[in-house]
């Protein structure tokens, strides 16, 4: 039998392996009895989780949902697997400058670890308990590239569609958006395709936007990226400060990227941000987008 002749397993082997246990632990710890599950869409995961929470609340299935994501894949199998795919930067002599989205010398992403959670709440419920409201979720979008297992569509078709879907859901015009926290992983193909998609969706207004990739500072947080970058977008609204895309060097320009776009290179910029849009894209062609807007009392 397996008990007599097979390998010995820790009784926590299965619970520690399945991703839904993270959501389960939060439910157990705080006594939450509402919808409880985990989403999985690679690097779009926690944005999809936020979208799910938003949809459940507006469907009347819950008043409050804790939603987010975490990832800790800096281990031999995680780094080795991404390295075998040639997805990681090889700038090993200067790792702190290796994540350089939208620069010509970018050569792959840097892995990070982290997590983030947001408390999403039905507006009247939040007001009734005098909650501190940082921003409102205005709309969400989802799409699929239907192109390749790991590479984004070279023309950014999925990225374009997901932003249009989110704008439609929010009942907003492109001209209302002030800041885009881009997926921007510092990969040769992905950054070009996302920049193309932004120009197609926003037209001339693309040149009035602030655009930045906080992955230049955090590394790629994989399944946690959407949650952490949503928080960065919300704080840009709250504080009127757009975080930068660091590590860009003078003249390090890619001929396939339009530098008339304001990528907020190297230094945070003050501006009023009433609406912020956050993109996350994942292996498998998963695209997710969430739009936040300033809360007007």
Range-by-range predicted roles:
Residues 42, 185-187, 217-223, 280-287:
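Glycine-rich phosphate/pyrophosphate-binding beta-alpha loops
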Residues 93-170, 179, 297:
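Condensing-enzyme catalytic core mediating Claisen C-C bond formation in acyl metabolism
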Residues 22, 49, 121-122, 155-171, ...:
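Short, well-ordered amphipathic alpha-helical segments that serve as non-catalytic structural scaffolds
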Residues 147-159, 185-202, 221-228, 261-262:
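Short glycine/threonine-rich loop-to-helix capping motif typified by GTGT followed
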Residues 1-52, 61, 85-110, 196-227:
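Conserved catalytic cysteine-centered active-site region
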Residues 25-29, 45-125, 225-297:
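Conserved beta-strand-centric core segments of catalytic alpha/beta enzyme folds
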Residues 36-41, 62-70, 132-140, 175-182, ...:
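Beta-strand segments within the central parallel beta-sheet cores of soluble alpha/beta enzyme folds
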Residues 31, 58-59, 127-128, 168-171, ...:
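Residue-level signal for alpha-helix termini/capping positions
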């Amino acid at each position: 039998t397996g008990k007599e002749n097979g390998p010995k397993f820790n009784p926590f082997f299965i619970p520690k392996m399945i991703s839904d246990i993270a959501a389960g632990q939060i439910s157990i710890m705080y006594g939450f009895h509402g919808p409880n599950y985990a989403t999985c869409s690679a690097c779009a995961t926690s944005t999809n989780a936020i979208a799910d929470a938003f949809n459940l609340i507006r469907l009347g299935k819950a008043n409050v949902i804790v939603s987010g994501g975490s990832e800790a894949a800096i281990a031999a199998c995680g780094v080795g697997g991404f390295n075998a795919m040639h997805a990681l930067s090889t700038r090993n002599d200067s790792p702190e400058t290796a994540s350089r989205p939208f620069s010509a010398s970018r050569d792959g992403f840097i892995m990070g670890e982290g997590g983030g959670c947001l408390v999403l709440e039905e507006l009247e419920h939040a007001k009734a308990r005098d909650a501190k409201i940082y921003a409102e979720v205005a709309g969400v979008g989802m799409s699929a590239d239907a192109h390749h297992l790991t590479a984004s569509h070279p023309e950014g078709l999925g990225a374009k569609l997901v932003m249009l879907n989110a704008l439609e859901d929010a009942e907003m015009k492109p001209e209302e958006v002030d800041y885009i926290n881009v997926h921007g992983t510092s990969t040769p193909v992905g950054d070009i395709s996302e920049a193309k998609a932004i120009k197609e969706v926003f037209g001339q207004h693309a040149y009035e936007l602030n655009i930045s990739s906080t992955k230049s500072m955090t590394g790629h947080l994989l399944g946690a990226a959407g949650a952490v970058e949503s928080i960065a977008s919300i704080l840009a609204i709250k504080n009127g400060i757009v975080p930068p895309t660091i590590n860009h060097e003078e003249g390090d320009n890619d001929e396939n990227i339009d530098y008339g776009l304001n990528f907020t290179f190297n230094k945070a910029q003050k501006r009023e941000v009433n609406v912020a849009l956050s993109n996350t894209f994942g292996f498998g062609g998963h695209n997710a987008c969430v739009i936040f807007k300033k809360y007007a009392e």
